[in-house]
UniProtKB/Swiss-Prot annotation:
Cofactor binding remark: Binds 1 Fe cation per subunit.
Broadest EC class assigned to this enzyme: lyase
Top-level taxonomy: Bacteria, Bacillati, Bacillota, Clostridia, Eubacteriales
Enzyme Commission number(s): 4.4.1.21
Subunit structure: Homodimer.
HAMAP family in the record: LuxS (MF_00091)
Binding site for Fe cation: H53, H57, C124
The protein's name in its UniProt record: S-ribosylhomocysteine lyase
Functional summary from the UniProt entry: Involved in the synthesis of autoinducer 2 (AI-2) which is secreted by bacteria and is used to communicate both the cell density and the metabolic potential of the environment. The regulation of gene expression in response to changes in cell density is called quorum sensing. Catalyzes the transformation of S-ribosylhomocysteine (RHC) to homocysteine (HC) and 4,5-dihydroxy-2,3-pentadione (DPD).
């Protein structure tokens, strides 16, 4: 079997950033998948499931309620390796195109207080596995990167 595209990225040199993972075409519709890499793979500790789960709930809620991107959001969810998230949008985008959106979203995550949306037994199959303070921490940390993001953090390393 051939490796899938995401397994051909050199995870030994990959740093936190926002990368176009792939673009798929369905008829005339382009779908862009983004690799939102929050930690340095195999270098930094991965995020724990509780904060990943919380970021997923907050990020998905933010995106599905966004004035511009709500109807373009196909999916937002964690990578199995717990080093980041995938964001799938309808449209042909570059990493630069979505930096403003991600700045808004991660500020929302960093500043969020109160009940995590969907964190109830009726709404979620693992609602007790949440950690809002750590989600706030990761939101602040990634916001700092987004505020000063450089080109090398917007394109996969060779």
């Amino acid at each position: 079997m051939e490796k899938i595209a995401s397994f051909t990225v050199n995870h030994l040199t990959l740093q936190p950033g926002v990368y176009v993972s792939r673009k798929d075409k369905f008829g005339d519709v382009v779908i862009t998948t983004f690799d939102i890499r929050m930690t340095s793979p195999n270098e930094e500790p991965v995020m724990n499931t509780a904060e990943v789960h919380t970021i997923e709930h907050l990020g998905a809620t933010f995106l599905r309620n966004h004035g511009t991107y709500a109807e373009k959001t196909v999916y937002f969810g964690p990578m199995g390796c717990r080093t980041g998230f995938y964001l799938i949008l309808q449209g042909d985008y570059t990493s630069n195109d979505i930096v403003p959106l991600l700045r808004e979203m991660y500020k929302f995550i960093a500043d969020f207080k109160g009940e995590v949306p969907g964190a109830a037994a009726r709404d979620c199959g693992n609602y007790l596995d949440m950690n809002l303070p750590m989600a706030n921490y990761w939101g602040k940390k990634f916001s700092a990167l987004l505020d000063n993001i450089s080109e090398d953090r917007l394109n996969y390393p060779e």
